[in-house]
Swiss-Prot record:
Lineage: Eukaryota, Fungi, Dikarya, Ascomycota, Saccharomycotina
One GO term describing the cellular component: mitochondrial inner membrane
Cross-referenced InterPro entries: Mit_KHE1 (IPR018786)
Origin species: Saccharomyces cerevisiae (strain ATCC 204508 / S288c) (Baker's yeast)
Gene Ontology biological process terms in this record: potassium ion transport; proton transmembrane transport
Name the UniProt record assigns to this protein: Uncharacterized protein YDL183C
Family designation: To S.pombe SpAC23H3.12c.
Pfam families for the chain: Mit_KHE1
Amino acid sequence: MIRSIFIPPTSITATSRLFYGMRAYSTKLEKASLQKYLHDPVKVTVIPITDKESFIYYKHTDNLFNSQSRILKAEKWIVEKSAKLWRKLKKSPKSYNKKIVSMVQSLLNSTPWSENSLLTIPSESYILKRIKGEKDKTQEIRLTLKDYTVKAEQVDTQPLHVYYPPGISSPDECLRQMKKLYQEGLIYHKKWTLYCLLGLPLTIPLILIPLIPNVPGFYLSYRAYVNIKAYLGAKHLKSLLESSKQNLEFRELLGYTEVYKRGTSSRTQGNQKESKGAPELLLNKKTLPLILDFLEVHELESDLNKVILQESKSQEKNKI
């Protein structure tokens, strides 16, 4: 297995390396079967939207969560309570509750889909680091971020695999898109976290009116939380790309490209000409169910539907 390691640019003589800043990644790529992908406990999956944009999905098993984190436990409790309250509100037969749900849903659909991508990337402190055993390299040891930081220079980190469809995407394109995602995410979500927190005090007078729920306050609190989560996801993604201690390996996922081809084979020549000059929408209503089934990521259905809706509207505006 070929590892992606940090090497100072001056020491690189091989041509089969891809540079990202001061890091170098091997471009001697390995192919991965669908079964290997499905059994990978933690991975990054690149889901092309157009030939220029992709949805970056960080997926991991639940046993990789840092169960010792009090913050994570508290957050989980709050999220469960909030979700229960939201479900109750959605089921309410009262007309004003239905209007509130419709308004909030409309606002949520207007947030950039890149936010949903970053929300799949947990805070780095929430995930246990996987390292190789000192004597037995086939053994996997899991450490909290705090313990890993102390030992990082003396241990070998288990690789994080990045799966993509060959022919549609490539390692350099994946890196470009991930870099753009975290750079824009850090700026955008830091700014909107601040805006939401500044707006919260303005909703306090509504608390004094018992018959009217403080919907703006609840919404701004939720949006502040989401923006913080997305910001931390962007920070984690930056660490994965820039830290020499991280170990990224790119994998061509066998059969992945063919899934896209099956979904786009019905496109007519006229439609192709009509969209000339604009990025082709590779992720659409036909390819979506095929991708969800192939990758077994049905939990992303609402997120990817949001992507299709926003990108379709964007293309329609560009045609005018």
